Amino acid sequence: EALKRDVKTATIEREGDKLIVRFKSAILFDVDKTALKDDATTELADLARVLKDYPDTVLVVEGHTDSSGSAAHNKKLSEQRAQSVIQVLVSDGVDRSRLTAKGWGEDKPLQSNSTAEGRTQNRRVEVHIAPNQELKKADAENAQKSS
């Protein structure tokens, strides 16, 4: 709920025991750029504020592109964008040891790249939030105690 309330330009989805915070690339970056837009740092600061309240989570920041350009260029661009997001989260107080960057390039599209709308959907950064091993262990122990 805190994510939905505080991170207004992202969509939030639950997938099993993790949450996915999805930012459209246009919100964070100019076309074919890795430097964050000024407004993006505000959005990421809001995300960092929530993440600091949940230190027992691990975070994978994933960059994604559409299929425009070469696959090698898109992979590098997506990796650099994921790193840019991590740098801001760390500067806003999120522990670096919790963060991993992954650049998928055009390998994991949400929609077909054959339309402009599909390509827009595919250009994105996702922050996957999952419980760390200690939290998973504590949850398993609590589940055993209550059964």
PLM region spans:
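Residues at or immediately flanking beta-strands
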Residues: 11, 18-20, 58-60, 98-100, ...
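Short, aliphatic-rich beta-strand segments
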Residues: 19-24, 28-30
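Periplasmic OmpA-like peptidoglycan-binding domain that tethers envelope proteins to the cell wall
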Residues: 64-138
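Periplasmic peptidoglycan-binding/anchoring modules of Gram-negative envelope and division proteins
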Residues: 4-6, 28-63, 90-91, 120, ...
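Short secondary-structure boundary/capping segments
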Residues: 11-12, 19, 51, 117
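N-terminal targeting leaders that direct proteins to extracytoplasmic destinations
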Residues: 1-18
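Short low-complexity stretches enriched in small and charged residues
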Residues: 15-18, 55-56, 80-85
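Residue-level preference for alpha-helix termini and adjacent loops
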Residues: 26-28, 35, 76, 109
